[in-house]
């Protein structure tokens, strides 16, 4: 008897469809699957891939970040495309005229964009508007903005580590002595 082949690493782990059963998302997937196949544009392939992603991999994009990214040279008059949610940012005083396409736009962000004379498209409208993604800028929110990422990395307590430890309380007696002050062993 020979040693059999290990089949545990055969499967390529990647999404081929969204996990969600949302019928409207599924319709968009149908549309962009067609466009990705029939057009030779990478834009449609990227949008399709992002439609499959989980919520944590489609972080919300704030209005301020979008304005900042759209102010960069060569992006005037282009459509900002976000496969995710656009949220409002109260720190922004004036909103420029923007043309935006997103899966969702929060109510306050929506009213502010429209008030500034901007335009909000859905992805099916974008497919009619620019089927190859011409004149668009693909944007996404900060994926590592979630608090949980602060706990990842080098173990807390090791030299040069800025990783946040999981502590039940932030009091004086919790992870504040050895390794945090020179009088208690060492400080790093």
From Swiss-Prot:
Region Disordered, residue ranges: 150-188
Cross-link Glycyl lysine isopeptide (Lys-Gly) (interchain with G-Cter in SUMO2) mapped to chain: 119, 164
Swiss-Prot/TrEMBL keywords: Cytoplasm, Endoplasmic reticulum, Isopeptide bond, Phosphoprotein, Ribonucleoprotein, Ribosomal protein, Ubl conjugation
Gene Ontology terms, MF aspect: RNA binding; structural constituent of ribosome
A GO BP annotation: cytoplasmic translation
GO cellular component: cytosolic large ribosomal subunit; rough endoplasmic reticulum
Subcellular location: Cytoplasm, Cytosol; Cytoplasm; Rough endoplasmic reticulum
Family listed: Belongs to the eukaryotic ribosomal protein eL18 family.
Functional note: Component of the large ribosomal subunit. The ribosome is a large ribonucleoprotein complex responsible for the synthesis of proteins in the cell.
Subunit structure: Component of the large ribosomal subunit.
Protein name in the entry: Large ribosomal subunit protein eL18
Source organism: Bos taurus (Bovine)
Lineage of source species: Eukaryota, Metazoa, Chordata, Craniata, Vertebrata
Name of the gene this protein is made from: RPL18
């Amino acid at each position: 008897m020979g040693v059999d082949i290990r089949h545990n690493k055969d499967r390529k782990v990647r999404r081929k469809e969204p996990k969600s059963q949302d019928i409207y998302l599924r319709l968009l997937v149908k549309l962009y699957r067609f466009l990705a196949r029939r057009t030779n544009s990478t834009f449609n392939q990227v949008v399709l891939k992002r439609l499959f992603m989980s919520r944590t991999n489609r972080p919300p994009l704030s209005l301020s970040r979008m304005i900042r990214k759209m102010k960069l040279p060569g992006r005037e008059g282009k459509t900002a495309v976000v496969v995710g949610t656009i949220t409002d940012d109260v720190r922004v005083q004036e909103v420029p005229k923007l043309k935006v396409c997103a899966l969702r736009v929060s109510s306050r962000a929506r009213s502010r964009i429209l008030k500034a004379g901007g335009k909000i498209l859905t992805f099916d409208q974008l497919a009619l508007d620019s089927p190859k993604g011409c004149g668009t800028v693909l944007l996404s929110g900060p994926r590592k903005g979630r608090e949980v990422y602060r706990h990842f990395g080098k173990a807390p307590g090791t030299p040069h580590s800025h990783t946040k430890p999981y502590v039940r309380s932030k009091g004086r007696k919790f992870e504040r002595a050895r390794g945090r002050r020179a009088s208690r062993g060492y400080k790093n």
